[in-house]
């Protein structure tokens, strides 16, 4: 999955990526989400250690949908999208960010959510060209 648009512009944008990633993982696929362009800013930590995604709360309707998807009780569903992305990373989805774009947005070494790994531009190109399936996001 290659993500270039800002993830924090709406609940729909933030959530739409999670469901297919989770479904592909649960079907036994190796999933890598490449954060590129403005998408990298969603994972920038502020002075309190929070990202913009930590400030996008999970809607009640999303909680109802995510509980069975994550196979957890409703109270255990994360209340924000930052934690949801961290769960994806812990469960085996590789979340990477284009190092060149990180530098362009002047995001320092300690300012990126630890769930995200940095890769250089050549690795981004390799990932998006050497795959069995490629899902650009947003889909137009």
Task: Name each model-derived stretch.
Residues 49-53, 113-116:
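Short, hinge-like loop/turn segments at secondary-structure boundaries
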């Amino acid at each position: 999955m290659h993500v270039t648009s800002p993830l924090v512009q709406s609940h729909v944008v933030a959530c739409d990526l999670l469901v297919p990633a989770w479904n592909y993982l649960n079907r036994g696929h190796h999933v890598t989400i490449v954060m590129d362009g403005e998408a990298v800013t969603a994972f920038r930590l502020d002075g309190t250690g929070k990202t913009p995604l930590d400030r996008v709360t999970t809607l009640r309707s999303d909680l109802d949908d995510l509980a069975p998807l994550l196979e957890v009780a409703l109270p255990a569903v994360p209340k924000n999208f930052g934690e949801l992305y961290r769960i994806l990373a812990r469960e085996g989805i590789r979340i990477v960010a284009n190092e060149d774009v990180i530098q362009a947005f002047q995001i320092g070494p300690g300012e990126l959510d630890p769930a995200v790994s940095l890769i250089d531009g050549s690795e981004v190109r390799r990932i998006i060209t050497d795959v069995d399936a490629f899902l650009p996001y947003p889909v137009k």
